[in-house]
Regions:
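Glycine-rich phosphate-binding active-site loops on the catalytic face of alpha/beta enzymes
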Residues: 1-17, 55-67, 109-130
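Short, well-ordered coil/turn segments that N-cap beta-strands
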Residues: 3-4, 30-34, 51-53, 87-91, ...
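Alpha-helix-loop-beta-strand connector modules within alpha/beta enzyme cores
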Residues: 20-41, 71-91, 133-138
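Short, glycine/charged-enriched secondary-structure capping and boundary segments
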Residues: 20-23, 49-52, 69-72, 106-109, ...
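Conserved N-terminal beta1-alpha1 strand-loop-helix module at the mouth
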Residues: 34, 42-52, 121-122, 126-131
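Catalytic cores of alpha/beta
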Residues: 36-51, 93-114
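Metal-centered catalytic cores of metalloenzymes
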Residues: 42, 75, 84-89, 104, ...
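Catalytic-face loop-and-helix region of soluble metabolic enzyme cores
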Residues: 59-62, 81, 89-96
Length: 138
């Protein structure tokens, strides 16, 4: 099918800790890489010990908004990047990431990449928006 990743615990579909563990096991049994969303610094800490490839830090209050996590929570991104790195995980950040500058700031703060949705889907030219964000990550 070409499926390579499983995105778990997004703020629009939060699941219990037991469901997270079961979902990770199910994904791993299918050789999928796992992206586990964390809504807080505490969750980043807790989830970094699990068998996942990526932790995606996305504060729910910023999702779909005009304020980027990269500019509003730089200290948490730095700390989350350190926690992830110490545990062999890569950090993604999302929430309000809409511009090349937002994406570049996330990487400079220690993130390996970004999660985007409304910033691309709702753009006048989604392809151009996506290309601009990708340019910042290369």
């Amino acid at each position: 099918m070409g499926i390579k990743y499983s995105l778990l615990n997004h703020s629009e579909r939060r699941i219990s800790y037991d469901q997270i563990l079961a979902s990770i096991n199910a994904a791993r049994s299918r050789q999928l890489e796992v992206v586990l969303c964390a809504a807080s610094r505490e969750e980043v800490n807790k989830f970094a010990e699990l068998d996942v490839n990526y932790i995606a830090y996305e504060p729910p209050e910023l999702i779909g908004g005009d304020v980027s996590v990269s500019t509003s929570k730089p200290d948490i991104i730095r700390e989350a990047a350190s926690i992830c790195s110490s545990n062999g995980k890569r950090l993604l950040v999302g929430a309000g990431v809409k511009t090349e500058e937002d994406a570049r700031a996330a990487v400079l703060l220690g993130a390996s990449g970004i999660l985007v949705s409304s910033g691309v889907v709702l753009a006048r030219s989604p392809g151009t928006a996506l290309s601009s964000l990708a340019k910042a990550l290369s």
